[in-house]
Amino acid sequence: SAVSNRGEKFDPAIQPTLNMYNEYFGGGMNAIVFQEMRESRGLAYSAGAFLITPSKLKYPYVYRTFIATQNDKMIDAMKAFDEIINNMPESEKAFNLAKDALITRLRTERITKSDVLWSYLNAQDLGLNTDSRKELFEKAQTMTLPEIKAFQEKWVKGRTYIYCVLGDEKDLDLKGLSQYGPIQKLTQEELFGY
């Protein structure tokens, strides 16, 4: 798992593109991350990457990635992941699948019961007074892959990360892992409190 925080604050103008980027790049089984890491390269059981929208105005955007892989494939998986994050593969077919999936989800998603209140309060926490899904739905219709690439270049490429690796130390390539920065080993008690 890796996390990157550059301190960027909430910007409603980027939200439609951010949502489409997440759908295209890091979303489900048709997303670039899953297709590249699992299907094409066989380096992961599961993988994902998302630019996470802050829940309040005072919080920053955070980029979060995860890879579930075998210990002996860890370094290769990390290198491949860094490569596709910084040099995002472009596939018009995958983009159209992502676009259709996002539009379909927006068409069928309903906010009901107590979720109406929670959605309203969450919007208020971000300084919004309308349902942001409306703008997302409208902009998604005409969004293009070059727009997603430009977003990736500005908001994702070149980030620095804090990595978290879980595994049996004797099975991990610590020398290879050290190329990503200093290694800090944590005990079970430090992680879980027992």
Roles of regions detected by a PLM:
Residues S1-D11, F34-N87, E92-L145, E153, ...:
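M16 family metallopeptidases and their MPP-like homologs
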Residues S1-I32, F66, G193-Y194:
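His/Glu-based metal-binding/catalytic segments typifying zinc-dependent metallopeptidases
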Residues S1-R6, V165-Y194:
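An aromatic/glycine/proline-enriched structural segment found at the starts
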Residues M29, K73, K170-D173:
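Short phosphate-engaging motifs
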